[in-house]
UniProtKB/Swiss-Prot annotation:
Gene name per UniProt: pckA
Protein name, as recorded: Phosphoenolpyruvate carboxykinase (ATP)
An individual GO BP term: gluconeogenesis
The species this protein was found in: Baumannia cicadellinicola subsp. Homalodisca coagulata
Binding sites annotated in the UniProt record for ATP: 211, 230, 246-254, 295, 331, 447-448, 453
Cofactor note: Binds 1 Mn(2+) ion per subunit.
Subunit structure: Monomer.
Pfam families: PEPCK_ATP
Main location: cytoplasm
Localization in the cell: Cytoplasm
EC number, as in UniProt: 4.1.1.49
Segments traversing the membrane: none
Amino acid sequence: MLSNNIIRQQLIHYGITDCCELIYNPSFEQLVREETNHNLTNLERGTITNSGAIAVNTGIFTGRSPLDKYIVCDNDTHHQLWWSDQDKTSNNQPISQITWQYLKKLVSKQLSYKRLFIIDVYCGAKKNSRLRVRFVTEVAWQAHFVKNMFIQPDAIDLISFEPEFIVLNGAKCTNPNWREQNMHSENFIALNLTEGMQLIAGTWYGGEMKKGLFTVMNYHLPLKGIASMHCSANVGINKDVALFFGLSGTGKTTLSHDTNRALIGDDEHGWDNDGIFNLEGGCYAKTINLKPELEPEIFQAIRCNALLENVMVRADGSVNYHDNSKTDNARVSYPLNHIKNRVQPVSCASHASTIIFLTADAFGVLPPVATLTNEQAQYYFLSGFSAKLSGTERGIISPVPTFSACFGAAFLALHPTVYAALLAKRMNIAGTNAYLVNTGWNGNGSRIALKDTKAIINAILNKQIQDTPTIKLPIFNLSIPQILIGVDSNILDPRTSYINSSEWQNKARSLAQLFIKNFNKFTLPLTCKKLHNAGPQL
């Protein structure tokens, strides 16, 4: 283990001086004592729930702040990155080196003269591509989050651990000069990919630490020819690997936690010449409306060492997972070893045989499942479509479409077509089959039942879907099965959920126009005419 003197010298290099005490890679037991200390107040203090998990609040920041994300634009990144001033769907807002230095001084000043938690971890399960990362924070539960979410080095590795990337979390400080610097607010998440550092200020949301590193890996891995993906992954007893892509709320985590399949990871993965590997060492699952009978793997993972965010804790220490008074984005982080059926000892597996693109369509247009051609797979990957309701929960009143390239535009460092090309290459080599699965709503305003979605996933993974007759869905030209075991055949064709089929036709045309408008921005060689033709046609 590194000595305190060495770490203090390294902190000085980051601009952090005169630390009162350093707590280096503490155990979970020590972190629990620290984060539940009665002398702590407000957002620093955690509560022990009756499951043994710690519950914390993140204040007004119950989700990511994409408008407060910045990356230093320098000679190395200027021509490589997908910048927001070139495409408004990118969250990569450029800042100058001068602004960066100012922000760095703010955060380093905040962390100076403090008791600090130093956590050294790996991002990436593959030794030849993993990143050595150091997190520095003054908040115990933030250190707990990091320990849950990333891969822990062993004692031997820690003796000579040399971080390649530094994360300074100064959640307690803000930027008083944000207006003069043309920034969105006093809060910021800033990355310097050349220097190898991330700064966090103003926001307490734990996910900023996790997703900041994902952006970093989305920069480094593709430049090495490795596909980086916002997806969950699991593997069957026959070593068949499935990837689940999808935006938040589409079921990515829920559907990949399967008692019959070993979990590789729930959110971030790479795909190299050897196969699939996890970038993380933990899971970050939504807990709203969590029920043990529907999501038993996640429910049983909430125990000692798990960290709950923004849940409602009752006086007796129990948690009300149905209370969304704080946020619909209540979450829990826990280490992968909380999942009994997981890939061991490292989160790696062979090449993917199946890819499932999850969408939660609130328009009532898309089918519960469709088989995709190679071109359609690239089209829907680049589109990254989902939708949510701005009206009531029941009934499709005012769908809000979301197009997030590669099902993770907020985390991409390079242009989306770079990731699409790498994924297409890996799929072609491995002979991967792709499917579109809609976990959203049908024409009568009912959400597709989880039991039906799970039966659809089973039909895909056991290859039953490959032997069933199909029909073509007009406008979108999607191949949909006519029958699947365990699934009500009446829901497979979305048109049957409408009393008047012309109503589906009208909604389908409206949604198709949105797809076409969104995809028109992709004009590079990869997205040639055949990819445009793979989408809906009017």
